[in-house]
Design a protein with these regions (language model features):
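Bacterial N-terminal signal peptides that target proteins for export
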Residues: 1-8
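C-terminal motif of bacterial Sec signal peptides marking the signal peptidase cleavage site
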Residues: 14-17
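Bacterial signal peptide processing site
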Residues: 19-21
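Alpha/beta-hydrolase-fold serine-hydrolase catalytic core, especially in secreted/extracellular enzymes
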Residues: 23-122, 127-132, 305-309, 314-404
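Loop/turn elements at helix/coil->beta-strand transitions in domains of secreted/extracellular proteins
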Residues: 132-137, 154-159, 217-219, 240-244, ...
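Cap/lid segment of the alpha/beta-hydrolase catalytic domain
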Residues: 139-214, 218, 251-260
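Primarily recognizes the serine-hydrolase "nucleophile elbow" in alpha/beta-hydrolase
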Residues: 202-266, 278, 289
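Mobile cap/lid helix-loop segments that gate and shape the active-site cleft of serine hydrolases
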Residues: 211, 248-300, 321-329, 335-342
């Protein structure tokens, strides 16, 4: 049968609709999951015991599960709500008209207004030679965090130093922190809600000043190590404008799964963490009650999906519980794998080096993620899952929901 020319455009449209949807690597909104209905938050005794790692694809109300990417935003909404309620407290929501920003030479200055009070933030930017715009790495404390600067400087990547103390101190005293001045009714929140709020305000500032920043906002990364590695993880999890998160040696409360850590030795468990970083009420889930926590930190890591995440570990420090990091990273990566984008999540765990001192053997892995996700080089291989010392660990027993 001969096709008329009128039918050809229709056929083209039909064929296009059959093509798989391209999964974004970054978004232009802080949180695309902010418009879903609030879910119920049962008390401790009403929560079911879940001995293994909770299914990241299961609905919170027990009505089933979905592994469709189109449903992932709703899953993110539910996980974030549970994370806020049971672990870190709500990250304050800010309207754009309450923020002012300007460039002061190579320093971005941001002012946030709320309730008649103001909070001032500043971020020094280390620029490469040239006019830009440049991809950029937000580093906790330093322009590139604890990662070697030459990895970024040799690639003409800017570094943005995030001064977290302008938001909240390392061991907060509730009610006396800078953020408490503009949110006096939210003094219960943990630092891992407050610090990511500050990172998001720096990104807001970059958006407000626009081309003056000389920063490519489609290619922003964040990194930090140890407690700052957790900070980077939570920041990447809670702001979808961050294209690449590198969590270096984050330890307990970071990528490590609380449930797995509870089975190990002298490590940072839920009952032995720093509660200035979390809600004080999270302590109710310590020890034998950890199985009642409705989420775990493989889901916190998975909040970064479908964007890029690289997790770095260091087995020389028992407290970091890198076996837990390994199991949780495996479980989190299952989310990326389910969506057919497992190359966007990797992990590398290695010993024989100082804390927060990246060994040369891990340079290529960091460079690969930087090249692919900050410099747009899709040909770079980022299928990195290196933790040879844990090759005999039965991680699958922790994730019965995963595809065998």
């Amino acid at each position: 049968m001969k096709l008329s020319t009128l039918s050809l455009p229709l056929i083209a449209i039909m064929l296009a609709s059959c093509q798989p949807k391209e999964i974004p690597t970054v978004y232009d909104r802080e949180n695309t999951a902010d418009n879903y209905t609030a879910i119920e938050m049962p008390g401790l005794q009403q929560l079911p015991e879940i001995a293994t790692l909770p299914d990241p694809f299961a609905w919170a109300d027990g009505s089933g599960r979905s592994t469709r990417f189109d449903d992932w935003a709703r899953h993110r909404s539910e996980i974030i709500q549970q994370l806020y309620h049971y672990e870190i407290g709500e990250k304050p929501v800010v309207s754009r008209d309450s923020i002012e920003a300007f460039m002061d030479n190579d320093t971005l200055r941001v002012t946030v207004h709320n309730g008649g009070e103001t909070l001032n933030l500043s971020a020094t930017i280390k620029y490469p030679e040239g006019d830009g715009p440049f991809p950029a790495m937000i580093g906790v404390g330093f322009p590139y965090g604890s990662l070697p600067p030459q990895i970024f400087e040799s690639r003409n990547i800017a570094g943005i130093a995030f001064n977290f103390t302008q938001v909240m101190s390392h061991t907060q005293k509730r009610g006396t922190e800078p953020i408490n001045r503009i949110y006096p009714d939210m003094i219960q929140i943990g630092a891992y809600s407050a610090w990511p709020w500050g990172v998001s305000r720096i990104i807001d500032g970059l958006e407000i000043v626009g081309e003056q920043s000389r920063i490519d906002l489609k290619h922003l990364g964040i990194t930090g190590c140890s407690f700052a590695g957790k900070m980077a993880l939570f920041s990447g999890a809670l702001d979808e404008r961050i294209a690449l998160t590198i969590a270096q040696e984050p330890g307990g409360g970071g990528v490590d799964a609380w449930r797995v850590s509870e089975t190990l030795g002298n490590v940072e468990t839920l009952g032995r963490t720093n509660y200035s970083w979390f809600l004080e009420s999270m302590a109710q889930f310590a020890e034998e009650n950890v199985s009642r926590l409705p989420i775990d930190h493989h889901q916190v890591a998975a909040l970064i999906a479908p964007r890029a995440l690289l997790v770095l570990g260091n087995t020389d420090f028992e407290w970091l519980a890198d076996e837990s990091n390994y199991v949780s990273s495996r479980a989190a990566r299952e989310v990326w794998r389910t969506f057919g984008i497992e190359e966007r999540m990797g992990f590398s765990i290695e010993g024989n080096h100082g804390h927060c001192q990246l060994p040369e053997s891990q340079y290529p892995e960091v460079e690969a993620f930087v090249d692919r996700f900050l410099l747009d080089k899709p040909e770079i291989d980022t299928n990195i899952t290196r933790a040879d010392m844990f090759s005999e660990v039965d991680y699958m027993k922790w994730m019965p929901w995963a595809e065998k």
